[in-house]
Amino acid sequence: MAVYAVGDLQGCLDPLKCLLERVAFDPAKDRLWLVGDLVNRGPQSLETLRFLYAMRESVVSVLGNHDLHLLAVAHKSERLKKSDTLREILEAPDREPLLDWLRRLPLLHYDEQRKVALVHAGIPPQWSLEKARLRAAEVEQALRDDQRLPLFLDGMYGNEPAKWDKKLHGIDRLRVITNYFTRMRFCTEDGKLDLKSKEGLDTAPPGYAPWFSFPSRKTRGEKIIFGHWAALEGHCDEPGLFALDTGCVWGARMTLLNVDSGERLSCDCAEQRAPARPAATPA
C-alpha cells in the first residue's frame, strides 16, 4: 500500500487527477492524504468533493479554513464572499451527504504506524503532539454534534483570543484552537498569533516567527505534513516537516508527496486560476 499526501486542492480537481494518474493511484489499496482546503476559489469545488466522497474509504483529510467556511455558509453562520466558488455545492442535490462527510473530518490526523501528523496550518510551538491531538478533538466533537455545530460555526470567526490559555472555555477556547490548526503562519514562541501577515518567511512582524522555527517547539523531532502557506512554495527547511501548499489555485503547481519515500511530484496549475490573484497571499 502506498500513501500519498497532496497539498491544498481549493477546488482544483484536474491537477489532482493528473498527479494520481502519474503514480498509478489505486483506491483499492493505496491511500490519499489531504492537508485540507479541499474547496473554494478554484473552478471545481463541487466536482472535487464528489470525487473525494466517492472514494472516501481511501481518503484521509483534515479540515482547512476554507472547508470550515463552507460549513459556516451552509449553516447560514456566514455569507458567501465575492471570491468564493461554493455556490454550486450549496445548490447541489447531494449537498447534505457531502457536507456531513466534510464536518466529520478531523483537524489533526496521526498515523501511528508511520509516526506522521497531518494538519492544515500547523501545530503551535508550545503544544506537544499529545496535547495537540487532545485540543483538536475538542473542536472535532463540536463539529460532529448536531446541537453544538451551529453554536460553534456562529462563533468560529475572529482573531481573539490570540493566544492559548488553559483557562479559556466555551467558544473562545474552540476559536483559538481552530485558528492554530487552520489559519496559523506566524506566532511568538509562547503561541501568540499574528493572523494578518500572510507572505514569506521574511515578512514576520517584530517578535514573531514562523510557527515551526522556534528551537523550543515541542513537536521538534516529529514528522508533520501541512499546507495552507502558499508563499513557502513547498519549502520550510525544517527536518521532518513537509510543506505541501504550492499555490495551485494561484497558477503555480499542485504537489504530491510519497509519505514513505519522501519523493515529490508536481503538476502545473496555470490554467486553474479562477479569480485574479490579490496583492497578498490569501488566508
UniProtKB/Swiss-Prot annotation:
Catalytic activity annotation: P(1),P(4)-bis(5'-adenosyl) tetraphosphate + H2O = 2 ADP + 2 H(+)
Pfam families: Metallophos
Domain of life of the organism encoding this protein: Bacteria
GO annotation, cellular component aspect: cytoplasm
GO BP annotation list: RNA decapping
Gene3D superfamilies xref list: 3.60.21.10
Molecular function terms, GO-annotated: bis(5'-nucleosyl)-tetraphosphatase (symmetrical) activity; phosphatase activity
Record keywords: Hydrolase
SUPFAM superfamilies for this protein: Metallo-dependent phosphatases
InterPro entries for the chain: ApaH, Calcineurin-like_PHP_ApaH, Metallo-depent_PP-like
Enzyme class, first EC level, given as a word: hydrolase
Family named by the database record: Belongs to the Ap4A hydrolase family.
Function in brief: Hydrolyzes diadenosine 5',5'''-P1,P4-tetraphosphate to yield ADP.
Protein name per UniProt: Bis(5'-nucleosyl)-tetraphosphatase, symmetrical
Species for this entry: Pseudomonas aeruginosa (strain ATCC 15692 / DSM 22644 / CIP 104116 / JCM 14847 / LMG 12228 / 1C / PRS 101 / PAO1)
Gene symbol of the encoding locus: apaH
